[in-house]
Structure formats: structure tokens, C-alpha cells
Amino acid sequence: MTLSKYSKPTLNDPNLFRESGYIDGKWVKGTDEVFEVVDPASGEIIARVPEQPVSVVEEAIDVAYETFKTYKNTTPRERAKWLRNMYNLMLENLDDLATIITLENGKALGEAKGEIKYAASYFEWYAEEAPRLYGATIQPLNPHNRVFTIRQPVGVCGIICPWNFPSAMITRKAAAALAVGCTVVIKPDSQTPLSALAMAYLAEKAGFPKGSFNVILSHANTPKLGKTLCESPKVKKVTFTGSTNVGKILMKQSSSTLKKLSFELGGNAPFIVFEDADLDQALEQAMACKFRGLGQTCVCANRLYVHSSIIDKFAKLLAERVKKFVIGHGLDPKTTHGCVINSSAIEKVERHKQDAIDKGAKVVLEGGRLTELGPNFYAPVILSHVPSTAIVSKEETFGPLCPIFSFDTMEEVVGYANDTEFGLAAYVFSKNVNTLYTVSEALETGMVSCNTGVFSDCSIPFGGVKESGFGREGSLYGIEDYTVLKTITIGNLPNSI
């Protein structure tokens, strides 16, 4: 079976496959320059999309700004209807949308289908939240005054998204923004723009007004486009998922207009297994947590801390299970795990692997390049007894390297886990509820998952602390990041009767 047979998409609805930006309800190129979208599994070109200049971004911002003047006055029930339509359309087109993800991202089709279901759930959630944007009534000290608060949409939102979840990272942000009455300008990653364009097509079918949902495209001009979104006074909010370094740049650029920001940045998640944990459960959850997307998710376990009394057994059993993975092209039905996104990802895995080995880590599963499959295929690596001085204890690998560290006490492992500038997610496995509660409170992360390695859901507030960012996506809190709280006072009322 050759990989090249998968390089051109065959979709039930060919209209989902687009190669132009989307502004004001129109498919816009805006330039003769293009960049190529490549299937990371085969290395073959699957699309050529426009390298849009700053002028096109400014056009999209202007359109979103003008549309906001009317969109903000649509009723919550109207917006809920469009959001619900979007949810239904995503599920109706699940196979096509998942195929697009697999071709541009490289993940296995089963994982891609899971992403579409997860992504769609945010439209369903915010369809239900849109009519429930509440304020409060307040009795101030002055007996003749009455105060109440309302939440209003912040305005045009710039949404800058990563490649690892090409659909879900858009919906987590755009669904909340659209629900409260904001308009959006979306900049997808240049490696995975096709999912965003498919979503724009569905947004039109769902009934969203022209100009409320816009998608801009660029590879070489990406820094300029991001800077334009951050510095434009017409853009009132920027939300970004990606690296901490880029987040810091965007934050600096946004300071000139004091924008509302929400960032979901780098992670370095600890996965802690105490000696009393259910070992089978911890192993199954470690596999799901560490190797989902072949380790290319922001909440993947980057550091596994296993109690010294069970570390060798845990490492051996984990390796036995990981050996059963079937690495291959994501569209091959036999494949359980696809490829990594590019050669830089492989280079980082190998750098972290060799550094840990040089410092004394034991190789449990060698892993390595699978060049016979393609340039970006890599078998998982498992190392045990990794020293705390290894680079991987400080840096997020974002790939199929599983380093296992040893610990003896609760205090010791919490110290290890918190010894990082990142604080997105953490995992704790134990049968003792006191251990779970005590460690969860002590961990310096925005989210702690106990006895499960998969926790993300539209109903939970997703976000981090420290240099993993700020703001929350999903849940009843996620909608607040796209609103401003206004206080209204009515004064000089007569005495109460």
C-alpha cells in the first residue's frame, strides 16, 4: 500500500475543500502568491492557498468591525439557532471534516473523528449558553440609587490557532465569541488551514450573517498578520493557542491598544502515579494521555513520575502495550497512530531522547524514525529512571517521547512537578482520596485530572496558570472572556414606599 494514494481528498461534499480565504461571505484570494499545504505523511501537496498580505487582513478586520454593529444586536435565541445549526452540520459532515484533518495534520482518522465530535460540542454548548448571559442587581450604600450589571460583547475578536487541533481550537474560541455577539477574524496555522476553510463554508450554511465569520490565510506573512490583529484598534480581543514565546510577542504587540487577551500556551504536564494506584488503569490512561496525537497535544503527559517501588514494572508493562501501536498513514483503517507534523518535531524528540540517555536514563523502548513509511513517521520512545537534570524535565517535547522519573514521597513529587514555569494540566493516580485532594491543591496548574488521562470537555473551564497563559475556554466561565461587564446606576430614586 503506497501512501501517495491518500494525498488527494475524496469528499462526500466537495464544497468543503476550499483554497481561498473567506471574508464578508465571499471566497477571497487577494493575491497571486500562494503557499502549499502538504500531507505530512506522504509529503505530497494537497492544496495551494493564497499568501494573503496585510491589506487583506485589514479588509477582514474592517468587515468584522462593521458587521459587529448589527450582529451584536441579534437576539441570543437567533445566535443559539445558528450555533445549533453549526453543531448539526459538523456532525452531518463528520467523515469529510475528519478526512481533511487527517490529510493536513497527519493524525489517525479515528482521532480526527473524535476531534470533530469534540469540536462540534462547543457549538452545542454555546448554543445553550447564549441565552444565559446573566447580570446582577446591587444595592449600593446610597438608598436612592439602584445598580445592575450587564454583559456586552467585547467586539471584533482575532483568533489565532495552532495546527495540532485544526478544528477544535477554532470552535473553542469562535463558538463562545459568536454566542455573545462578537464577530471573528480567524488565522489558522499555515500547515493546517483547510479545516478552518471548511468551517467557514459550514458557517455560511448555518445562517451566520456575512462578515461575522472570517478566515485569513498566510505562511510567510504570518508574523505581520498577527501583528496587525494585535495592533488594530478595531480588534478588541485576541485569543491564541500556541507556544509561550509567541504568546509573549502577541501580548507585547497588543499592549498598544490594551486589548482583552486569552492565551493557552505551552504545557509540561506531570503525570503522577503513586504506589497504591490501580496499575492497569494508570497504564491505559498513560497511553491515552501521552500518545494521543502521537504526543502532540498541549495537555499530553510530558513527564511521568512513577513511585520508585513500581517504576520498573510500570515501564515494562507500558512498553508492552505501546509496541502494539500500528503507525501508518492516518487514512489507513489499520492505523492507530499517524505521523508527526514535520521534521522539526522529530529533531526535538531525538534531542530530548539523547540528552536523557547521556545523563543516565534507561532505554525501555528504543523507538525511532520509520523512514520506510515516510519522512515524518516516528515510533514511540520510552525511557525510565530519567534524571531531573534532563532537558525534558524543563521543556515540552510535543512528540512521542515518554520519559519516566522516579519519586519516593508526596512532597518530593509535588516539588518536581511544580519545578517549571508552565502550569497547564497535571494528572494524579491514587486510590487514596486524601492523596488526590492534597496533591491536586498543591500542584501549580490550571487543571488537575485524577485517575483519568482524558478530561477535556466543553463543560469544563480549560486553561492554565504561570507561563501556560490565562483565560478559560468552555464551561459557564468561557463566555466571560468575550464580554465586558458594564455597571449601570440609576440614581435619585424616591424614598421607598
Curated annotation (Swiss-Prot):
Optimum temperature is 25 degrees Celsius. Inhibited by AMP, ADP anf ATP. Pathway: Amino-acid degradation; 4-aminobutanoate degradation. Keywords: Cytoplasm, NADP, Oxidoreductase. GO terms for biological process: cellular response to oxidative stress; gamma-aminobutyrate shunt; gamma-aminobutyric acid catabolic process. Pfam families: Aldedh (PF00171). One of its GO terms (molecular function) is succinate-semialdehyde dehydrogenase [NAD(P)+] activity. It is an enzyme of class 1 (oxidoreductase). It comes from the Eukaryota. Catalyzes the oxidation of succinate semialdehyde to succinate. Can utilize both NAD(+) or NADP(+) as a coenzyme, but has a 2.5-fold lower activity with NADP(+) than with NAD(+). Functions in a gamma-aminobutyrate (GABA) degradation pathway that allows growth utilizing GABA as a nitrogen source. Functions in the GABA shunt, which allows to bypass 2 reactions in the TCA cycle by removing alpha-ketoglutarate from the cycle and feeding succinate and NADH back into the cycle. Belongs to the aldehyde dehydrogenase family. This is Succinate-semialdehyde dehydrogenase [NADP(+)]. The gene is UGA2.
